[in-house]
A protein has these predicted regions:
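N-terminal alpha-helical targeting/anchoring segments
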Residues: 1-134, 149, 153
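TRNA-recognition modules of translation machinery and tRNA-sensing kinases, especially anticodon-binding
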Residues: 27, 130-429
Length: 429
């Protein structure tokens, strides 16, 4: 959410930013917000003037009564009562205006970083760099669920009977591999200086609206019936929520947390073979990282965060590349975002395995996450988040890139201690 003062003073910048994000339907909101802001300030001024006049007039009542001027005192009382009624009327309108103003402000997108390429959607994202050499083996790489089935490692039919589409049972070595990836990711991030965190897996609506747009909320979140609670779609929301309504001395920043959690999302593709299996599902696990920092440090932390993901994948010999998300692919709260994609030998192309985002002060402004400077002045922090690894998608990349012609799957050195020392997985069928 933008600062209303910024919108008031820079309406054309805000409108051009909306055009750059190809959201022209929101242009009228800028003028509407400015009108509501003007009305809100005028109401406050009138209420303040009325209260001052009422206080001044009220003092006359006692003096008039002492002088025996009862009739004049009664007239003054009527004036005071009329002022009070007008104040109540204006206060009610002020509440309505402020609610409408906030509602519209939360729909206007954040100002994107000048370095963000302008484009309509993810097809116009820009490749930044490749890490590792993509390999296409001289044998056919099966679909990831077919590989898993060779190890009796997945049962989607049973999961479908239990929970419906978008769920799975992982079994045996594949389930162990999944857990090994998470354990390694946890230790990897702790070694990078992040504090390990196990957060709540449900959050209240004020936290949900503080960390994402209404559109994202509708598309992603499962609401608990009869409760002001939502299942988290990612642990970054719960971790950022930890700092709601806080004021942190700037010398105590940055706050760097990493968390493993299950994630629950309504989204699921309806078409296309790549939507089968564990690529896009309702429930999955993820190792996430967040940073709460001073504004001048957020760009530096942004680069550190996405590099963590690249480094993690490279320890498992999986080629990856980074993509700069274009303006139209950025969610409304994001200032800048980079996707990390892993190489798929089967598809002979890269696919998304993680995303790193700088939210600027958008989440902090909504959640009142503030910093106190050495001069005692307070300002909003910047927040960032990044995926270290989401094991379901990592399993796809891992199995495809480590599969051998005879069906064995090699286990990189980094994971072996979490797999009981195993150097490979041998298919059972």
């Amino acid at each position: 959410m933008l600062d209303i003062k910024f919108v008031r003073e820079n309406p054309e910048i805000v409108k051009q930013n909306i055009r750059n994000k190809f959201q022209d339907n929101k242009l009228e909101l800028v003028d509407k917000v400015i009108e509501l802001d003007k009305e809100n300030r005028e109401i406050k001024q009138e209420v303040e003037a009325l209260r001052a006049e009422r206080n001044k007039t009220s003092k006359q009542i006692g003096a008039l009564m002492a002088q025996g001027k009862r009739d004049e005192a009664e007239e003054v009382k009527k004036q005071v009562a009329a002022s009070g009624a007008r104040i109540d009327e204006l206060s009610a309108r002020e509440k309505e205006v402020e609610e409408e103003l906030l509602k519209n402000m939360m729909v206007i997108p954040n100002i994107i970083d000048p370095s963000v390429p302008i484009g309509k959607d993810d097809s116009e994202n820009v490749e930044i760099e490749k890490f590792g050499e993509p390999v296409v083996p001289d044998f056919e790489v099966p679909y990831h669920t077919d590989i898993m089935e060779r190890f009796n490692g997945i049962d989607m039919d049973a999961a479908g009977k239990v929970a419906g589409n978008g769920f799975y049972y992982l079994m045996g070595d594949i389930a162990r591999l999944h857990s090994a990836i998470i354990s390694y990711a946890r230790d990897f991030m702790i070694d990078r200086g992040f504090t390990y965190c196990i957060p709540p897996y449900m959050i209240r609506s004020n936290v949900v609206t503080g960390v994402m747009s209404f559109d994202e909320m509708d598309a992603m979140m499962y609401k608990i019936e009869g409760e002001d609670l939502y299942l988290i779609g990612t642990s970054e929301h719960s971790m950022i929520g930890k700092f709601i309504d806080t004021i942190t001395p700037e010398e105590e920043l940055p706050k760097t947390l990493t968390s493993y959690s299950p994630c629950f999302r309504k989204e699921k593709g309806a078409h296309g073979i790549e939507e089968r299996g564990v690529y896009r599902i309702h429930q999955f696990e993820k190792q996430e990282m967040i940073v709460v920092c001073k504004p001048e440090e957020s760009k530096m932390w942004f680069d550190k965060l996405w590099q963590n993901t690249v480094d993690f994948f490279r320890t498992m010999d999986i080629p990856v590349r980074t993509l700069e998300c274009c303006s139209g692919d950025l969610a409304d709260l994001k200032v800048k975002s980079i996707d990390v994609e892993a190489w798929s030998p089967r598809q002979k192309k890269y696919f998304e395995v993680g995303s790193c985002s700088n939210l600027g002060d958008a989440q902090a402004r909504r959640l009142k996450i503030r910093v106190q400077g050495k001069d005692k002045n307070k300002y909003f922090a910047h927040t960032l988040n990044n995926t270290c690894v989401a094991p379901p998608r990592m399993l796809i990349a891992f199995l495809e890139n480590n599969l051998q012609a005879d069906g064995r799957v090699l286990i990189p050195e980094a994971l072996r201690m979490y797999m009981g020392g195993k150097a490979e997985l041998v298919p059972v069928k």
